[in-house]
């Protein structure tokens, strides 16, 4: 068996040699901002990680779990570092689309991924995967260099710089605006940037005062721009109008992996739940592990960001309710964002 700690050590060594070595805006934003938009940029380590995940020796071990840098994997690190973690193979990838073919081919068993990607995988595999739990709620925040915005209504007539045009951040923003009586095309000027760093640079230069950004990039931005503050938590604003939680990430799993040993999978989920609890109570220890495993570039950044990343372990009926409502909003905006159709009931594990 290949011990997961050795796998992660190799991946981390490569990852920390590249841009993650610093804690500046560019390095800290790449995981969170792109994760919110469903796709992440691949680091130099991704090829090695993919090769490790697909090797015959790795395939012979227990559950093979993939993760991405950023909030969707932060809740897993305590399990990864535990003695029980040696029973599983954890591999980190630089981009969500690297994980898709491996899950489809059965070279991975489970993955912590953006929620809408899980729905797309369900369609792509003709129902061969299911969602086991929600691991991350909303990570989007409206920040302002000023004190004008106290409610969504205050965004009328304002310019908002953000990322993710044609992806989930756009759909979330437009939904919250419209449900608060604002026309996203007439009442607000939304300027889309290619990266969160570009959006922040406009705020820094005084070209804009309001931006919608993801964690943990928000934490870095607050330390870099004097007077910048969190004006609105988009998770809270979503709850007000949707009556459910805004979802960012989930754990998706192949049904055949669960059926092969249902008790073992439940044991994994129990360990996952304990790991999430530790992530929310032992911030310092979890933050250190996030740096060790290359999930967040610096422990100090992770420790500040963790309370705002809305890391959860939600399963069962509540999971289904939150996901169905979330997927419906995405489907109404663009059916392809959830794979072209709403997932059927068999997509929701244990419900």
Q: Predicted segments — roles?
A:
Residues 2-26:
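Sec-dependent N-terminal signal peptides of Gram-positive bacterial secreted proteins and lipoproteins
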Residues 258-333:
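Secondary-structure end/capping motifs
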Residues 324-351:
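Conserved C-terminal helix/tail region of periplasmic/extracytoplasmic solute-binding proteins
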Residues 83, 236-244, 311-320:
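Short, solvent-exposed loop/beta-turn-alpha elements that line the ligand-binding surface or hinge
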Residues 116-117, 198-290:
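Pocket-lining segment of extracytoplasmic ligand-binding domains
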Residues 37-42, 51-185, 190-192, 209, ...:
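Short, glycine-/small- and polar/acidic-enriched structural segments
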Residues 78-79, 140-150, 245-264, 315:
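A bilobed periplasmic-binding-protein/Venus flytrap-type ligand-binding module shared by bacterial periplasmic
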Residues 22-35, 39:
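Bacterial lipoprotein signal-peptidase II cleavage site
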């Amino acid at each position: 068996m290949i011990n997961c700690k050795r796998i992660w050590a190799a991946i981390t060594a490569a990852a920390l040699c590249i841009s993650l070595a610093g804690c500046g805006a560019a390095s800290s934003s790449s995981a969170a901002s792109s994760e919110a938009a469903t796709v992440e940029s691949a680091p130099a380590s991704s090829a090695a990680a993919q090769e490790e995940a697909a090797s015959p020796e790795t395939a012979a071990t227990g559950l093979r779990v993939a993760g991405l840098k950023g909030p969707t994997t932060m809740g897993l690190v305590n399990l990864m570092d535990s003695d029980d973690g040696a029973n599983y193979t954890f591999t980190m990838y630089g981009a969500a689309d690297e994980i898709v073919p491996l899950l489809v081919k059965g070279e991975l068993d489970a993955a912590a991924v953006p929620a809408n990607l899980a729905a797309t995988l369900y369609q792509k595999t003709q129902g061969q995967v299911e969602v086991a739990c929600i691991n991350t709620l909303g990570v989007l925040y409206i920040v302002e260099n000023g004190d004008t915005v106290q409610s969504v209504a205050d965004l009328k007539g304002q310019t908002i710089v953000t990322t993710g045009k044609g992806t989930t951040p756009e759909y979330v923003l437009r939904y919250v605006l419209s449900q608060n009586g604002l026309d996203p095309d007439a009442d607000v000027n939304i300027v889309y940037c290619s990266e969160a760093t570009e959006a922040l640079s406009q705020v820094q230069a005084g070209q804009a005062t309001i931006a919608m950004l993801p964690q943990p990039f928000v934490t870095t931005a607050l330390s870099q721009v004097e007077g910048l503050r969190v004006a609105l938590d988009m998770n809270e604003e979503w709850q007000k109008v949707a009556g459910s939680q805004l979802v960012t990430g989930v754990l998706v799993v192949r049904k055949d992996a669960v059926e092969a040993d249902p008790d073992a999978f439940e044991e994994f989920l129990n360990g996952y739940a304990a790991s999430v609890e530790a992530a929310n109570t032992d911030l310092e220890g979890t933050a250190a592990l996030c740096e060790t495993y290359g999930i967040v570039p610096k422990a100090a950044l992770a420790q500040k960001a963790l309370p705002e990343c809305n890391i959860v372990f939600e399963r069962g009926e509540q999971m289904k309710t939150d996901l169905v409502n979330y997927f419906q909003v995405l489907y109404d905006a663009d059916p392809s964002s959830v794979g072209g159709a709403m997932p059927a009931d068999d997509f929701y594990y244990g419900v």
